[in-house]
Structures are given as C-alpha cells and as structure tokens.
Amino acid sequence: MNTFEIINKDFRECEIPVGLVITDPPYNQDYSYNQYKDKLKVNDYVELLSKIPQPCVIIHYPEETINLLPLAMKSQCEQVVTWVYNSNTGKQSRLISFWGCKPDFKKVTQPYKNLKDKRILQRIADGKTGARIYDWWEINQIKNVSKEKTEHPCQIPEEVIRRIIQTTAKEGELIIDVFGGSGTTSKVAYELGYNTISYEIDPKYCEIAKKRIESVNEPGSEVSQDTL
C-alpha cells in the first residue's frame, strides 16, 4: 500500500528526500494566507524559489516563469506547458515548467477529434485509444462553487496535477510538494498509487490536506506530531 506524510514545517528546515517535486509556490501577489506574507521583496522571493529541489515541476504565472524562475534555478527549464482557463480577471493562464525532468505526452491520450478521417478510423481499429495530449491544457480553475474547493485561497485543480504526474513521474517515484497547501498534489499522487510527502507551514491547511487524502481510501501511514 502506498503511503503519505504531511509535515507541518517549512521545507527549508527539512532534509528533502529524493523524488519528483510538483508544486505551486506562493505567487508573491499578496494573497491572503493564514501564516504567510505573500509579498516579499523580489530578491527574497527569488531566494525562496531557489530552494525548491530539482527535479521539479513548478506552476506559476507567465511573467514570473519567464523572468524569475530562471534566476532562481540558475538554468533554463526543459519544457513548458500552458494551462489556460476562463477568468474574469486579466490573468487567464499559468505556465507549468519542468526543471531537470521532461513530460512524455504520449502517456496520456485525448479523444480523436475527426472520427471521419480514414487514418483516425484505422488507428481506432488498431486499438489506439486517442491522440497524445498537447502542451496546451484547458482546465477550469477552482471556483467557490467547485466540488474540489477547500478553505485554501489558491487551489490548483486536481486534473492539472494528475496530468503532470501521469506524463512525468517514473514508476515508484516519490512525489513531493514543498508548498503543500490544501494537499492537492499529495491527494492525486496517493490516488495514482505513489508515495507522497507534503510540506506545509500552516497547521490548518495540513489538517485539510490530511482529511482530503484520507478520503481517498484507508490511509497508508501513521501520523506523527510533525506530520499531524
């Protein structure tokens, strides 16, 4: 049985094990978190991002992905996926950047679009289930009326994390989130059969994450003081 661990600490104070980090860091946009001031000086913010271990997949707004992440990582990313969504604000997309790892889009398929095309019909006859997904993902944001919605102010849709894991993670690889939030990364990883660790400084969000993961099925780990 796979296991999960929720650690109520700043990841910078911990020894991070080897694994694939999938995370959406605080965006430095002055979001209202319980125990974190989301408005650092640029240099301090870059320093925070630089502590994210590689290999990693980082979800961020386009400006920060282009301008700040290369400074923090001291390199260029291997691949970028654009995640787009409908929004009433000016921000209608985020970039998913891959550092020290690369997605294999053939691992996830989408339905064929032109079912009258002879080539498509032949592929279906050959047992193909669909076309590989693109590097452009249209997935709705989590809104207040969304079934997935928790008390966390900035929540990533489970489908975004699911595609990242399915296209990028190796079999048996440990999935890590260093900005755990409401536990979406660990919940999806746990559902998919991966062992997972989530680091989060806010005990309230840790408790939300724990309940979400335990709702999948019987939890696979005992919970200590550090892991709530």
Language model features: what each stretch is:
Residues 209-210:
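Conserved SAM-binding loop
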Residues 213-228:
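Class I S-adenosyl-L-methionine-dependent methyltransferase module
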Residues 2-199, 204-206:
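Core catalytic lobe of class I
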